Regions:
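Hydrophobic faces of well-ordered beta-strands that scaffold small-molecule active sites
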Residues: 3-7, 33-35, 69-72, 120-123, ...
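Alpha-helical scaffolding within the catalytic cores
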Residues: 18-22, 51-60, 151-172
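Active-site beta-loop-alpha junctions enriched in small/polar residues
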Residues: 10, 38-42, 74-76, 150-151, ...
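Generic structural signal for well-ordered alpha-helices
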Residues: 19-23, 56-60, 106-110, 135, ...
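Short, flexible, mixed-charge acidic loops at enzyme active sites
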Residues: 77-89
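Catalytic domains of cell-wall/extracellular-matrix polysaccharide-remodeling enzymes
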Residues: 93-164, 190, 194-195
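C-terminal domain-boundary segment and adjacent tail
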Residues: 30-37, 188-251
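Active-site beta->alpha N-cap acidic-glycine motif
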Residues: 1-65
Length: 251
């Protein structure tokens, strides 16, 4: 199995020390990841360091170098209690809203990126949550790809190509054919966590590839049975995570 990486929550006011540490790691091994850029961050949880004016120029330079960029929502603010079509979480910036509301949010995010010199047709939903209305609005705005879903090959659904993430990290390291994504949230990463990623990449370097390799693979239509299975897996994984957090709160 070929493995690529994606980094969520990329903003001008992110944890720059962690980001730059991961940047050096990916540059060292040449496995350029996908970056999920929040066009207009209003989520205080993502605000770690003072915003850097050079952020947008930095993103342009990384894109020119071979890193892949995506639009990570618009504001990264959860305003509904819906899990949508891929319910890893029970909250969303998009799922459950009308077409007009979602189109306006997505169009606003797209314009903010374009105004800063960044063009992408790849969408990354905050919290992994979206619905069929999100996909319809994305398609109307010219987006072609979504980074989400479970699987080991790209697939087509509702006219959009999905580039899957790993259901469980341990399943990504198998002898099966295909390609999947490991998700990284770099803010507040520890030295130990960074070291673990370095060891992971070094031990599997023959299977670690740039995210852009996804675009070389053929995408096939997702069967309804696979869609149902994916929904059940996402709901179960999300529920287990929420129950785990609840247990810790009452421990």
């Amino acid at each position: 199995m070929k493995i690529a990486f994606r980094m969520d929550d990329i903003t001008p006011d992110m944890d720059w020390k962690s980001f730059e540490a991961f940047e050096q790691l990916f540059e060292c091994y040449g496995c350029y990841p996908l970056l999920g850029i929040v066009p207009d961050n209003l989520d205080p949880k993502l605000s770690v360091d003072p915003a850097r004016e050079a952020f947008w120029k930095k993103m342009q330079e990384l894109q020119e170098k071979g890193w892949t960029l995506s639009m990570h929502g618009c504001h990264h603010v959860y305003t509904t209690k819906r899990g949508g079509s891929f319910p890893l979480n029970a909250q969303s910036e998009f799922a459950g809203k009308s077409y007009e509301e979602q189109y306006q949010l997505l169009e606003s995010g797209q314009k903010k990126l374009l105004d800063r010199g960044i063009e992408t047709k790849l969408f990354m939903a905050p919290g992994h949550t979206f619905d069929k209305t999100t996909l319809r609005a994305l398609k109307a705005l010219g987006f072609t790809h979504v980074t989400d879903g479970f699987g080991d090959l790209p697939y087509v659904r509702s006219g959009m190509t999905f580039l899957p993430i790993a259901f469980l990290r341990k399943y990504a390291f198998s002898d099966r054919e295909g390609m999947t994504t490991i998700v990284i949230h770099a803010n507040h990463s520890t030295v130990a966590e960074l070291k673990a990623y370095e060891e992971m990449i070094d031990a599997n370097r023959e299977n670690i590839v740039p995210y852009s390799d996804f675009f070389k693979l053929e995408a096939k239509q997702q069967p309804m049975t696979a869609r149902i299975r994916e929904y059940v897996l996402a709901f179960g994984k999300g529920l287990a995570a929420r129950l785990g957090r609840l247990k810790k709160q009452h421990a």
